[in-house]
Amino acid sequence: MSRPVIVALDLDNEKKLNELLPKLGKPENVFIKIGMELFFNEGPKIVKQLSEQGYQIFLDLKMNDIPNTVYNGAKALARLGITYTTVHALGGSQMIKAAKDGLIAGTPIDKNVPKLLAVTELTSISDEILHYEQNCNLSMNDQVLSLATTAKKAGADGVICSPLEVKDLRQKVGEDFLYVTPGIRPAGNAKDDQSRVATPLQAKEWGSTAIVVGRPITLATDPEAAYEAIKKEFN
């Protein structure tokens, strides 16, 4: 089974979405990430429509609230036909457990329960921000390890983390966990707003379960060719 390459759709409306999606290939061959911008503009209906068309969907809303609110939010998201969704690991173990319970409760009987991924530290967070703004005295690796360990114990299926941290996490948190990594840039591409980045080949070698790639695919002259090239490099 090939490892997923997930296309980050950093778009804000359905018109732009409909212009891009046909350029990526057949729906059954495409795994997409929908974030806050598109979801908040177009609403849950767009997610359900895309799921019904055959797209695999990572709905990345990074829920972070009191457990009861997150439970009900996750329960609603589970009805949309998504494959992955996210919470912030910093929300704590009770919130993570509530999200997992909500996904189970909301999933239709004939569907698979979406995988719950906990966001550790965003790939835009540098060591300076971690130490001087978040007032965290741990190293980045130790902070991510702590958050990942908490998330696994609370019932999360995996974490969102930098590819730079995957090898260490696999050794210390375990192989029976998903390690989904943004911050992927093919060689020669600009880092944009990411601080901790790697190439698809490096992510493969370090053990990422799946990678998330946005602009190097969506802004390419031939998005489908760029997508297929990254899939090949990662698998």
Curated annotation (Swiss-Prot):
It catalyses: orotidine 5'-phosphate + H(+) = UMP + CO2. GO terms for cellular component: cytosol. Keywords: Decarboxylase, Lyase, Pyrimidine biosynthesis. Substrate binds at residues 10, 33, 60-69, 123, 185, 194, 214-215. The active site is at K62 (proton donor). Disulfide bonds: none annotated. Pathway: Pyrimidine metabolism; UMP biosynthesis via de novo pathway; UMP from orotate: step 2/2. InterPro entries: Aldolase_TIM, OMPdecase, OMPdecase_AS, OMPdecase_bac, OMPdeCOase_dom, RibuloseP-bd_barrel. CDD domains: OMP_decarboxylase_like. One of its GO terms (molecular function) is orotidine-5'-phosphate decarboxylase activity. Gene3D superfamilies: Aldolase class I. GO terms for biological process: 'de novo' pyrimidine nucleobase biosynthetic process; 'de novo' UMP biosynthetic process. Its EC number is 4.1.1.23. It is an enzyme of class 4 (lyase). Catalyzes the decarboxylation of orotidine 5'-monophosphate (OMP) to uridine 5'-monophosphate (UMP). Homodimer. Belongs to the OMP decarboxylase family. Type 1 subfamily. This is Orotidine 5'-phosphate decarboxylase. It comes from Lactobacillus johnsonii (strain CNCM I-12250 / La1 / NCC 533). The lineage of its organism: Bacteria, Bacillati, Bacillota, Bacilli, Lactobacillales.
